[in-house]
Every structure is written in C-alpha cells, then in structure tokens.
Curated annotation (Swiss-Prot):
GO terms for cellular component: axon; basolateral plasma membrane; cytoplasm; plasma membrane. Keywords: Cell adhesion, Disulfide bond, Glycoprotein, Membrane, Phosphoprotein, Signal-anchor, Transmembrane, Transmembrane helix. Residues 1-222 are annotated as: Disordered. Glycans are attached at residues 410, 417, 428, 636, 691, 720. The gene is Nrt. The lineage of its organism: Eukaryota, Metazoa, Ecdysozoa, Arthropoda, Hexapoda. The keyword Oxidoreductase does not apply. Residues 23-42, 63-74, 95-111, 141-155, 163-178, 185-205 have a biased composition (Basic and acidic residues). This is Neurotactin. It comes from Drosophila melanogaster (Fruit fly).
Length: 846
C-alpha cells in the first residue's frame, strides 16, 4: 500500500485513564512497527508518542466502552472531524518535559508504513477471544459517509441509532432474492465503486469496523449475495490497481474464513489511521466528488439501459458470432429455396399471348399474325396459307413458299374456320374443292415458347384422286390430353397433283413433272420448320402420320432426299405396296390420253382448261381401283395399270426397294408400317348376300383368279372360309396386308403391326380402326375394345415422343394388336400367298 502524505493536526491531550483504557496495539502492528524501527535507526519525533503506563494491561469490555464514549465526546473538533488516536508502542519510560514540548508543538500521527507487496495475515496473530468482547480498534473508526450517524453520536444516541439503522438496512428475503437475479456490474464498475466508496461496500466495512454498542446484540448478518461473492472473490483475486494500493484498500491475501472480519478491521484501523491529517477534508471532498460522479454515471447508464431502443438500433449494435452468421445464412438460403420453388410452381411467365374475349388467341407466322379459336381445351388455327396458290402459271408447278410481301397480310388473319379442300373426286363421282387450296390447320394445346411439344402431320386420303383428308382429321381433345400438336395440310390430288407429261417436263427446270402433291407436303414441312415454334411446337420432333393413300405418300417421302432434316419419324397405315417404278418418259406417254380428250396441243391449253373439264377428261380407270378378289384379266393387264406416282428424278429418284437394300439396322426406326385385318370391307361387297355361308364363299372364290389357279379348296381350308369375315380377310391379305409386310421385311428396322380386334356384328377390323383409335374416334363397347384403344394409343404416342415401339422385338417384328399388343414372329397367312405368287403381284395400287 502506498504511503499517504503527512499533514499536521492539532495535538490532542490524553489523560492517563484514557491511555489505560485504550486497547493495546495488535500484534500485527507491533511487528510492522518493529520493522520500521529496524529500518530507521533514530526514531523521528513526529512518529513517537508517549506510551501509557497501563498499555501492557488488558482492559475489560466495560471499561473500553466507557473510555470510548468519553473519547468520542472529546475527540470532535470544531469542524466536526473525528480524530482517532493510535496507541504507541509498548514502553514504560515516562514522558519528559522535552518530549511534552515536542508533542505540543509538532505532535502528529504518522501512518504506519507497510511495504508494498508485503504479506498481511490479519487473523494469524489474533488472540483467541470471543467476538462478543470486540476489538479495541473497532471503536476507533466511525462512519464518515453518513451525517445522520454523526449527529446521533454527538447527542449521545449513537448506540440506539446505530442499532435501528442496522435493523432498517438489513434487506428482507424478497429483496435479497431480487438482488440475486439482478444484473451484476462488470469488473470495471466494481473497481470504480470500490475506489469511490460504493455505498454497499462501505456499509459492510463500516458495520465491521464499528464497535458493538451493545454486547448482547448479535453481529450483523451478511446478505446472501455477499456470502456467495466473498469466498469467490478471495479464491480468485483480481489485480489491484495503483489507486487501491495508494489508498490502502487492497488486501494481501486471505488466511481463512474465520479471519475475514479481522482482516477488514485491521484494514480499517491500520490503513485508514493516517486520515487524521489536515488533508482529510480535501481527500474526502475528492472521494465524494468521485462518488457523486460515479453515481451520476451509474444513473445515466441505468437510464440509458431503461430507455426504449428501436429495433434498427439494436440490430446495428448487435455483434453476431460465426454461429449466428451461419444460422442466418441457413435461414436465408432456406427462404430463397422456398421462394424459387414457389416461383417455379406458381409463376407463369408470359410465354403465351392473352386470350381475346376469352376464346381467341393470336400466333405469329412468317407472313403475318394469325388468330385462332379455343376448342375443347385446345386452340385451333384453320386455313393458314403455307404456299402460293397453284393457279394460272403455277398450275402443275412445284409448290412455292410465300416469299412475296405483297401476298402477305398486314392485319391479323382470322383463321377460325376450315379452308376449302383441294379439288377432288368423291366416291359417288362428284367433284368438290378448289385449286387455290394450299392451306393447313394447326391444333395445339398451348401457344407458348417454353416446353415445345412434338408435332404430328396428318396426311390422309382414301385415294390419290380423293377424297381427302377422309378420317384423318385432328382432334382438339386428344391434342390436349396427349400434349401433341396436329398439323393437317391440304395437298393437290388427281391430275392437279400427279399429272406427268413430256410437255410439262420440257418447260421445267430441272426437267421434271408429276408428283406435285409430294412437293406440297415438302412445303408444309418447311413451313413447320420455320413457324411451328410460334404455336408451341418442336421443329426437331416431327412425325408424319399417313393413312391409306396418304401412307403411300409418306412411304415415298421417307426415302426422298428432299425431306432430310424436315421430319423425325413416320407412321404409315394401310398404304399401297405398289410404289412407283416407271420412268418419267413412260408415264408421260401414258398420260397424253388426257390431252387428246381435251383436244389440247400444248400446255397453255391445259392451263386454261377449267377444273371441271379436267376431271371430266380423266379416264375412269385412273380414278378407281377394285378392292375385290383378283380377276383373271388382271394377270394380263398388270403392266398397263395406271400409276399416279412416277420416278420424277427430283423428289423420287429410285424405287424405294432399292433404297431399303442400302439401309442398315437402326434401334430407332424412322418408319412404322401397319394395316388392319379386314380393311377390304365395303358395304357393297357385304350386300351381295344377306348371309354369307360356306357355299357362297366357295362360289365367290371360284369366280376369281384364285379359282382360276385351282386354290379354292386350299384357301377355304386355311381360312376356314365360312363367313363374310373370312372372305374379307382373304381379300385384305392379298391386296394390302401381305404386300405391305413384304415391303416391311425389306427394311431391317421397320416394325409392322396388324390390327385384329374387331367390332360390330361381324367383328371386323376395318381400314380405319387403328387411326380412329389413335385420334380418339373409336367407340369401344366392350372391355376388349377399350383395351385395344389403350394399346393402340400407347404404341403410337410413345413412338411420337420417344421414337421407339414398345412391343417391337428384332426377331419378332410383327405386332398383333388385338385387345393387347403382342409381338409375333410372322403373320402366317402371308407366306402362303407369297409362295403362290399372288403377293405382291395383285397388291392394291393408289
């Protein structure tokens, strides 16, 4: 502890009785004074003090109390200061006259010096005596903070007042519990409170330093918090500051819990004794100022803490740790993921144009915007022009895409209704349609640019002269349910779509004629490549679906170099097995019969002829081909039969069979071929007999080429021909099923299917059964028929989406589609007809 500055104080005279009543100095003080004497060889007159003759005697508690009361009354100076006399060292020599003179003039109390860092064990040298007796030093120091206690002591009521104050200041159980859970000040605040004389700490120290007024009163109890804090504070001592050392407030150590109170008493009696000097007023003033400043600061801090703080201020002052940052980052990431998922699931980007009046929608083409209409949950655009009208000079010219801005439109073209079909001949001999017919229909479930859908191009015609499109019309309901886009184009038919003449060949560059309908379909594929994306379609997934005469055109296009990159796969249903094999020159000579009938010498005359005159001049043998049993006259006229399709040298270079020979096996076939088991059925044939019996079937076979070849009995036995269904099955195998299977066998990767599931009273699988099931127009009435529809749709739409046929196996290439799709090694009846040279000789020709 640092040594306080020495200041002069007025001498205080003490009587012998008072000196005798004072308690002898403690053993610790004696030891410290002896060390000082050893250090200073000549004692200073300022520090010496006459010893009491009765210093060595032990005083009683009663005498101590009396002396204390008398001394307290005399020791108060004019200014109210308390002067505490410290007894001198044990000595027996009486004071001399010189000593008294020095005491009167220069007498002052010098504080005892304790070396800094010295060990102070207050309880080690204590005498064993009961606490009730008290210590003589306890009565020497009084409370300096409380003015009320000073006034009471001056009036003689110190004992009574101190007892009441002690009783009042003792906290109750509730207050102690509340203080236990209150926020504890920091170490720095505790240090400042100790320096400035905190009220709680001083009250405890004063209570210990004040002598017991009444021997019968029990010692004051410490609070629960102090009882806990004191052992912990002494077990883990904190570093003392220089102020603690200089003021004498520090403790050297703790000997035991029993000596804790004595340590505090020694601290008060020894360390605070020098406060008697004249600098006490200044020191007390400074301490009070510091105390007031500390109290004001503490009050300001409490007020600052109690002041309501905004959330933003709290967030700014918050110091987050690494764990807090990771938690916040995880929460933000989770919220972000939820937002992204919600955005993807609920948000619809404006990829589709809005509806007008709730049913009209607009799309864009290369020639201008078009407006479609909503139907059955899908959108239909009907009558979109895809090529220039093939009229006047463009009659018998290859189709040309619209590249002239003068042929386009400025406003939105309303494509709500179907356009007129191309001119054609119906089955009853009437003609319908118009030459300006190169339009197409688009049916799409969505008009959007994201998630493009596969495209199915419907090419249907019962014959190359018409009617078209026949049964092959797009279904809005199935477009929506299967997520595909249907495109159905018009294409030229009859003489307008297939006429090949030498005169036409000579004026064309490159020199070619005929197959104009094929160029129409090629133009459609080019239009799809450029525009289908605006209708929600995928130009990289285009499937050609041909039915009957349309299947024949599809088969030719698959083998043409003109369509490479314009389609992805093809499906041909009930097409013709007789494909063009005649050269262009030979076909041109055969078609000169038309010019002779029209009495035209040049092409200009033909272009000026009306469509009605041209249809009237068309030979009947060009329009109709018998779908019946082969007749004997066909054997001699097979080479002279008319064929609409030719080897034009532009679209069709060679016979498809020559192309198939060069093909290699492919896991994903580009063509699927198929037919129905009873596609030769006609109402005209059925009405020949009301009830077809075995005899009637035999008679009908005998009158055909089969009877001429003597195969009637074999055929009846093989087919069990005793009904109309068996007769139709024989005709279908000869004309269509077996010839198509023969073509499929020439292609290593082409699956072939046969529909055998029947309907109606005769259980016939008619020519349109497969296409009706694909487009949703087949009306099932039994469980077997419903399963057939499901199997047929699964075959087709899986192929459209993935490019493979589920039931196709390389060594079992024939798929028998009954109520289920079953792969088989072969279709047995065909081998018989092939062996008899009937197939493919008498195959149907379109």
């Amino acid at each position: 502890m640092g040594e306080l500055e020495e200041k002069e104080t007025p001498p205080t005279e003490t009587t012998a009785a008072q000196q005798e009543a004072l308690e002898e100095p403690k053993e610790t003080d004696k030891m410290l004074d002896k060390k000082e004497d050893a250090k200073e060889k000549t004692p200073s007159p300022q520090t010496s003090k006459p010893a009491s003759p009765n210093a060595g005697k032990k005083s009683s508690p009663v005498a101590e109390k009396k002396i204390d009361d008398a001394e307290l009354a005399k020791s108060k100076s004019g200014n109210g200061e308390e002067i505490i006399d410290i007894p001198a060292e044990n000595g027996t020599k009486p004071d001399s006259a010189d000593d008294k003179k020095i005491s009167k003039e220069e007498r002052e109390v010098k504080p005892k010096k304790i070396p800094i860092g010295g060990l102070k064990l207050p309880g080690f040298f204590m005498k064993n005596k009961p606490k009730a007796d008290g210590d003589g030093a306890e009565g020497e120091l009084l409370e300096k903070e409380k003015e009320e206690d000073k006034d009471k002591e001056a009036n003689g009521d110190a004992a009574t007042g101190s007892g009441k104050d002690e009783q009042k200041s003792r906290p109750g159980l509730g207050e102690r519990l509340r203080s236990f859970f209150a926020r504890k000040p920091s170490a720095e605040k505790e240090k400042k409170q100790l320096v400035n004389g905190d009220a709680d700490a001083k009250s405890e120290a004063t209570a210990e330093a004040t002598p017991a007024e009444d021997a019968s009163d029990a010692p004051p109890k410490r609070g629960l918090l102090n009882a806990i804090k004191l052992p912990i504070a002494n077990m883990i001592p904190k570093k003392k500051s220089n102020d603690d050392v200089e003021l004498g407030l520090g403790k050297a150590g703790l000997a035991s819990m029993e000596t804790l109170d004595d340590s505090l008493k020694d601290q008060d009696t020894v360390d605070r004794a020098p406060v008697k000097t004249n600098g006490t007023e200044e020191l007390k003033g400074e301490l009070k100022d510091e105390k007031l400043a500390a109290e004001e600061k503490l009050a300001a801090e409490e007020e600052e803490q109690n002041r309501p703080v905004s959330l933003l201020t709290r967030l700014r002052g918050y110091k987050c740790s690494v764990d807090d940052a990771l938690i916040v980052f995880g929460i933000l990431l989770f919220v972000l993921l939820l937002g992204v998922i919600g955005y993807v699931l609920t948000h619809e980007t404006l990829t589709s144009p809005p509806l007008r009046e709730g049913r009209y929608i607009m799309a864009v083409t290369g020639c201008g915007p078009v407006e479609g209409v909503k139907e059955d949950g899908a959108f239909a655009f009907r009558g979109i022009p895809y090529a220039k009208p093939p009229v006047d000079r463009l009659r018998w010219k290859p189709a040309e895409l619209i590249d002239d801005i003068n042929m386009c439109w400025n406003d939105t073209l309303q494509t709500h209704n179907s356009s007129v079909v191309c001119t054609q001949r119906l089955g009853n001999g009437t003609t319908v349609g118009d030459e300006d017919c190169l339009y197409l229909d688009v049916v799409t479930p969505h008009v959007r640019y994201n998630n493009p859908l596969p495209v199915v191009v419907l090419i249907g015609a019962e014959s190359l002269a018409g009617p078209s499109p026949g049964i092959l019309r797009p279904s809005a309901r199935y477009s929506r349910s299967h997520d595909v886009i249907f495109v159905r184009p018009n294409f030229r038919l009859g003489v307008f779509g297939f006429l090949a003449l030498d005169a036409l060949t000579k004026e064309a560059h490159p020199p070619t004629s005929g197959n104009y309908a094929l160029t129409d379909i090629i133009a459609v594929l080019n239009w799809i490549k450029l525009n289908i994306v605006h209708f929600g379609g995928d130009p990289q997934s285009v499937t050609l679906l041909g039915h009957r005469a349309g299947a024949t055109l599809v088969t030719l296009l698959v083998n043409s170099q003109k369509v490479k990159g314009l389609y992805t796969r093809a499906w041909a249903s009930s097409g013709s097995a007789i494909l063009p094999g005649k050269p262009l020159s030979e076909s041109g000579k055969q078609n000169e019969q038309l010019m002779a009938t029209l009495e035209c010498a040049d092409i200009q005359c033909l272009r000026e002829a009306s469509s009605e005159r041209l249809w009237a001049a068309t030979p009947d043998t060009w329009l109709h081909f018998p779908v019946d049993l082969p007749q004997p006259q066909e054997a001699n006229a097979s080479g002279s039969r008319h064929e609409w399709l030719v080897l034009d040298g532009d679209v069709v270079f060679e016979h498809p069979s020559d192309t198939w020979k060069r093909e290699q096996a492919n896991d994903k076939p580009v063509l699927v071929m198929g037919a129905t088991a009873h596609e030769a059925h006609t109402e005209k044939l059925r009405e020949l007999h009301a009830n077809w019996t075995r005899e009637e079937v035999r008679a009908y076979l005998e009158n055909s080429q089969i009877g001429a070849l003597g195969l009637t009995d074999e055929v009846i036995e093989k087919y069990n021909a005793s009904s109309y269904a068996s007769l139709v099955s024989i005709i279908s195998d000869i004309r269509s099923v077996c010839p198509l299977l023969t073509n499929a066998r020439q292609q290593p990767s082409v699956p072939f299917y046969v529909v055998t599931q029947g309907e109606g009273p005769d259980q016939l699988a008619t020519v349109d059964a497969d296409v009706q099931a694909i487009l949703g127009r087949y009306e099932p009435h039994t469980v077997e028929q419903r399963r057939f529809v499901s199997a047929m749709q699964q075959l087709f739409y899986y192929y459209v989406s993935h490019g493979t046929v589920q039931s196709f196996v390389q060594n079992r290439r024939v798929i028998n589609v009954g109520q289920d799709a079953q792969p088989e090694e072969d279709y047995l009846p065909c081998n018989y007809w092939i062996s008899k040279d009937i197939v493919p000789r008498y195959a149907r020709v379109d």
